[in-house]
Amino acid sequence: MKSLLLLVLISFCWADHHSDNYTVDHDRVIHIQAENGPRLLVEAEQAKVFSRRGGNVTLPCKFYRDPTAFGSGTHKIRIKWTKLTSDYLKEVDVFVSMGYHKKTYGGYHGRVFLKGGSDNDASLVITDLTLEDYGRYKCEVIEGLEDDTAVVALDLQGVVFPYFPRLGRYNLNFHEAQQACLDQDAVIASFDQLYDAWRSGLDWCNAGWLSDGSVQYPITKPREPCGGQNTVPGVRNYGFWDKDKSRYDVFCFTSNFNGRFYYLIHPTKLTYDEAVQACLNDGAQIAKVGQIFAAWKLLGYDRCDAGWLADGSVRYPISRPRRRCSPSEAAVRFVGFPDKKHKLYGVYCFRAYN
């Protein structure tokens, strides 16, 4: 019995001595395979990747297997990619691969494939990115009874903008808000996108829907009645409301476009219908709200002429503030929703590239 106690004491002393000499190398991840530990490990080299609409991106994912656990490798490896919803309660199938059998789903058909850089590479390539591709993706690798996962976030370069229709503020339920963004070449923004916009200076005093069904608004300069006086800046959260009955504005998100946005040089000012026809005559279409915001934010477009847009609003983009042209800040200035038949303005057009 004394011998056993002595052996235990010696073991503890040895462990303490060596733990004092151990340093953690933060640049490397060392995986130790325990006897009953995981035999399959899945990792993403990057937690987040960035791209833009129309571009291509690779979602990184690699797997590491214990060859002694799988014998001669008779188990086929199954790779599955899914997209996570904002509440993580539902997954949308994207791509599945097992040997020579591969399948893509929904809007990803013809746009996704495995990178295949090495035998253990499960990275997914997505081409011709759309606004809807933004979000978090899960890479799952299955071999026999073993499986493991990794999550990668896909972020898009773009701009968040507040939106309300001709009817006025606080007139959209959640479903109408989604459609309103789509009509303006955009999608309803996520909380992360709104938060990033707030950090970049977005200040807006009207609450709007976000993609997760919450209602929030960003305040950089707290004041009455916008966030309250003597309070800290931040994204104010109204919480979750009835998607069918509750009515608010909406925050939309858009990204780079494949085309030309421009102010049409025309000898006279135009009614709304004349503006629509003038763009058509020029081989283009009347521009949408998302396109004027994308041109302003991503291309630095600047024009001190108010012009019609597709939704019947009149706006103008200023990236270089100056006297009589948004002197206080760079912004897309909103004139309003004038009478379409009697008010005369210029027009902004958009010509898509084939």
Curated annotation (Swiss-Prot):
- Keywords of this entry: Disulfide bond, Extracellular matrix, Glycoprotein, Hyaluronic acid, Immunoglobulin domain, Repeat, Secreted
Q: Which residues form the Link domain?
A: 159-254, 259-351
Per its UniProt record, what Pfam families does this chain match? V-set, Xlink
* Residue ranges of the propeptide: 1-15
Q: Glycosylated residues? A: 21, 56
All disulfide bonds of the chain are 61-139, 181-252, 205-226, 279-349, 304-325
GO terms for CC? extracellular space; perineuronal net; synapse
Describe the function of this protein: Stabilizes the aggregates of proteoglycan monomers with hyaluronic acid in the extracellular cartilage matrix.
Q: What is this protein called?
A: Hyaluronan and proteoglycan link protein 1
* InterPro entries documented for this protein: C-type_lectin-like/link_sf, CTDL_fold, Hyaluronan_bind_Proteoglycan, Ig-like_dom, Ig-like_dom_sf, Ig-like_fold, Ig_sub, Ig_V-set
Q: Which family does the record assign? A: Belongs to the HAPLN family.
- Cite a single GO MF annotation: hyaluronic acid binding
Record PANTHER family:
AGGRECAN/VERSICAN PROTEOGLYCAN, HYALURONAN AND PROTEOGLYCAN LINK PROTEIN 1
Ig-like V-type domain residues: 38-152
Q: Cite a single GO BP annotation.
A: cell adhesion
Native species: Bos taurus
Q: Where in the cell is it found?
A: Secreted, Extracellular space, Extracellular matrix
